[in-house]
């Protein structure tokens, strides 16, 4: 049975009609609609701020809707809490995993509803029931293991197993593959297929178009809180979906590469990190105006390269030369003073102070430059530089005093890049710069990277998205298990060649 036929034959599980929700000064949802069927995966798409999360929070009992109707299994519902939604068969696998890390896997699975034997918890039954679910979903984790010892992908599987244990009819997945390797993604897709076969309806949120077209049956697009369209995946193109998301035709996914790299600016020779497993004997060159991508599977130690260059990972061997002169970056401060900048992978945990202002987050890497001879801060220069970040990075914000945590992922990333540009770096290193960013904002980040290359910055860009590396970079350095597997020209290589190199030392 094809996905299309299956979707047509399946039962309607959920209907959300004309749902409205307002916050002070903002109409987050304006007559939004969503219909989810059994035996199907339904993508909910839209740029950051389109209303996707708000709509699902109204369903899940986190927010109360202002207007509209929600029908679940044909009956009107208005859940007051997420616990009520769970008990009625609606489960959410959050992007920020919601597990108690210091307890066991099976404790997390049955938290608040332990099986009892008289007045005591029946641990034997809890173990058996957990193992039965894991066997059905092909999850290879010991139910007695502490959650803190699991990988991110294993934690994600536990969240899905928890939904399974509630006998959920609707399972909501928010960016479930953002931290997974290709192998782990394939395992997740197999579990999603099992949920479909069981009769579940899966609501799938992702910015990764390739995934949407691989596993989803239908797509609902929201823009500015409004329902735009619901389409069948088999009858749609990527360009049509993107056009509906952004409200305009996006004629190209990546900006045209017009810059020609110049002379060598950075030489990295025989880098080997102190604490193994890590990078071993890595050498490469970077030219002025060049965008060098770094590819590899999860665990390939891509991030270790930029951390070693930036002075936050100790080396036992290796030389770094800038303009032919050896530089020693023992700390991040030394690296900044030597002309290096690093936009880290985990934006929320290591890139921003989410409860503080855009101004603070724009200036924090360069505070020394705002000191007057009397050791006071020059508020005039601080305000001027913050405004430069907002204007030059095209940050959408009502004020420089707005907390950065209230901005979309794309705007947060622009502030971070702007912050580093204030330090006037010659080498800009970007680790997963578009992770968790919608497709319209991604294009703006790509344009920004191209503009910086035109200004003769040397740029190193790590990404797990192969089309992104091929579309944005000039050359791609491929890592495999901490070793350099090869360097290829982006215009002359393929995903297949890169994957072969990535597996070279496994």
Curated annotation (Swiss-Prot):
Reactions catalysed: D-galactose(out) + ATP + H2O = D-galactose(in) + ADP + phosphate + H(+); methyl beta-D-galactoside(out) + ATP + H2O = methyl beta-D-galactoside(in) + ADP + phosphate + H(+)
Molecular function GO terms recorded: ATP binding; ATP hydrolysis activity
Record localization: Cell inner membrane
Residue ranges of domain ABC transporter in the record: 14-249, 260-506
Signal sequence bounds: none
Keyword entries, A-Z: ATP-binding, Cell inner membrane, Cell membrane, Membrane, Nucleotide-binding, Repeat, Sugar transport, Translocase, Transport
Pfam families recorded: ABC_tran
Any single GO CC term annotated in Swiss-Prot or TrEMBL for this entry: plasma membrane
Presence of keyword Cell inner membrane: yes
EC number: 7.5.2.11
Keyword field contains Ribonucleoprotein: no
Uppermost EC category: translocase
Main location per the UniProt record: membrane
InterPro entries per UniProt: AAA+_ATPase, ABC_carbohydrate_import_ATPase, ABC_transporter-like_ATP-bd, ABC_transporter-like_CS, P-loop_NTPase
Oligomeric form and interacting partners: The complex is composed of one ATP-binding protein (MglA), two transmembrane proteins (MglC) and a solute-binding protein (MglB).
Family in the record: Belongs to the ABC transporter superfamily. Galactose/methyl galactoside importer (TC 3.A.1.2.3) family.
Cross-referenced NCBIfam families: PRK10982.1 (NF008215)
Function in brief: Part of the ABC transporter complex MglABC involved in galactose/methyl galactoside import. Responsible for energy coupling to the transport system.
Name under which the protein is recorded: Galactose/methyl galactoside import ATP-binding protein MglA
Biological source species: Haemophilus influenzae (strain ATCC 51907 / DSM 11121 / KW20 / Rd)
């Amino acid at each position: 049975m094809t996905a299309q036929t299956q979707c047509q034959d399946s039962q309607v599980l959920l209907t959300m009609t004309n749902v409205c929700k307002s916050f002070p000064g903002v109409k987050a949802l304006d007559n939004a609609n969503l219909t989810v069927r059994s035996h199907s995966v339904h993508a909910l798409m839209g740029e950051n701020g389109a209303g996707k999360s708000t709509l699902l929070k109204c369903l899940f009992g986190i927010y109360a809707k202002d207007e509209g109707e929600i029908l679940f299994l044909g009956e009107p519902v208005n859940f007051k809490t997420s616990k009520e939604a769970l008990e009625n068969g609606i489960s959410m696998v959050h992007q920020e995993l919601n597990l108690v890390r210091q307890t066991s896997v099976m404790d997390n699975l049955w938290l608040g509803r332990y099986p009892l034997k008289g007045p005591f918890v029946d641990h034997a039954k809890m173990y058996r029931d957990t193992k039965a679910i894991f066997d059905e979903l092909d999850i290879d984790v010991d139910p007695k293991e502490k959650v803190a010892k699991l990988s991110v992908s294993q934690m994600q599987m536990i969240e899905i197993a928890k939904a399974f244990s509630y006998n959920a009819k609707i399972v909501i997945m928010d960016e479930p593959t953002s931290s997974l390797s290709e192998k782990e993604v394939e395992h997740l897709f197999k579990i999603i297929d099992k949920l479909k076969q069981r009769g579940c309806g899966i609501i799938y949120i992702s910015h990764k178009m390739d995934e949407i077209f691989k596993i989803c049956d239908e797509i609902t697009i929201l823009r500015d809180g409004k329902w735009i369209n619901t389409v069948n995946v088999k009858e749609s193109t990527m360009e049509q979906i993107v056009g509906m998301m952004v409200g305009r035709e996006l004629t190209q996914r990546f900006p045209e590469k017009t810059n020609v790299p110049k002379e060598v600016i950075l030489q990295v020779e025989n880098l080997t990190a102190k604490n193994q497993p890590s990078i071993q004997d890595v050498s490469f060159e970077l030219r002025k105006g060049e965008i060098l991508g770094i590819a590899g599977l999860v665990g390939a130690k891509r991030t270790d390269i930029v951390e070693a260059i930036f002075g936050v990972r100790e080396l036992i061997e290796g030389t770094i030369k800038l303009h032919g002169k050896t530089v020693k970056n023992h700390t991040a401060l030394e690296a900044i003073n030597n002309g290096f900048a690093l936009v880290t992978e985990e934006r929320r945990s290591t890139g921003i102070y989410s409860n503080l202002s855009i101004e603070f987050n724009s200036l924090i890497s360069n505070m020394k430059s705002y000191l007057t001879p009397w050791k006071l801060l020059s508020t005039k220069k601080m305000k001027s530089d913050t405004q430069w970040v907002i204007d030059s990075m095209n940050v959408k914000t009502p004020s420089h005093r707005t907390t950065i945590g209230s901005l979309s992922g794309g705007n947060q990333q622009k502030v971070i890049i702007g912050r580093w540009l204030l330090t006037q770096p010659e080498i800009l290193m970007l680790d997963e710069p578009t992770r968790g960013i919608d497709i319209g904002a991604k294009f703006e980040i790509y344009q920004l990277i191209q503009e910086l290359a035109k200004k003769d910055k040397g740029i190193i860009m790590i990404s797990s998205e192969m089309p992104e590396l091929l579309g944005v970079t000039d050359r791609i350095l491929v890592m495999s298990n901490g070793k350099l597997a090869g360097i290829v020209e982006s215009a002359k290589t393929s995903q297949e060649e890169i994957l072969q190199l990535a597996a070279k030392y496994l």
